[in-house]
């Protein structure tokens, strides 16, 4: 079981989290232009698609509700990782630098996948942003991924009335 730690933030940290953020996304070496989160969405039930997009958009703009943001702490591999959560949705991410965060992936929490999914997320590659050029490329891919995710949600989400 993963321990979730309530974040006790300093005023400065709180202010930083409310600033606009930029996202990059974990990919694989085999396909460095396809973000893992897009593939992860295949295993997320359609009724949670809006939640995934809303959590991410609120995070970017610094408007997440209390309790939606948690640090992960129980496992050495997960040190430094955080999650956005609402209902069963978990979006795992890591702060890279300044206002840049790496989204590792998304899953829906179930009793039988808890540890496995956190381990999977912890083992994913964090993109190389050691140079300005690499960082800019990742930020560009991040914008493309956000558009792909938005389009995916628009097409596949479950409508409230049928």
Q: What is each residue range found by the language model?
A:
Residues 1-88, 96-101, 107-162:
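Basic, Lys/Arg-enriched alpha-helical interface segments
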């Amino acid at each position: 079981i993963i321990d979730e730690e309530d974040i006790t933030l300093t005023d400065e940290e709180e202010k930083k989290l409310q600033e606009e953020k930029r996202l990059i996304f974990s990919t694989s070496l085999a396909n460095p232009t396809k973000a893992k989160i897009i593939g992860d969405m295949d295993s997320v039930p359609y009724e949670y698609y809006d939640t995934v997009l809303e959590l991410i958009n609120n995070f970017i703009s610094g408007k997440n509700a209390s309790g939606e943001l948690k640090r992960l702490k129980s496992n050495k591999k997960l040190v430094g990782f955080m999650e956005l959560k609402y209902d069963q949705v978990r979006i795992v991410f890591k702060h890279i630098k300044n206002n840049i965060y790496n989204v590792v992936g998304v899953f829906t929490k179930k009793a039988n996948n808890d540890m496995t999914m956190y381990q999977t997320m912890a083992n994913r590659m964090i993109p190389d942003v050691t140079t300005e050029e690499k960082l800019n490329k990742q930020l560009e891919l991040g914008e493309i991924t956000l558009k792909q995710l938005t389009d995916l949600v628009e097409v596949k989400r479950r409508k409230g009335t049928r």
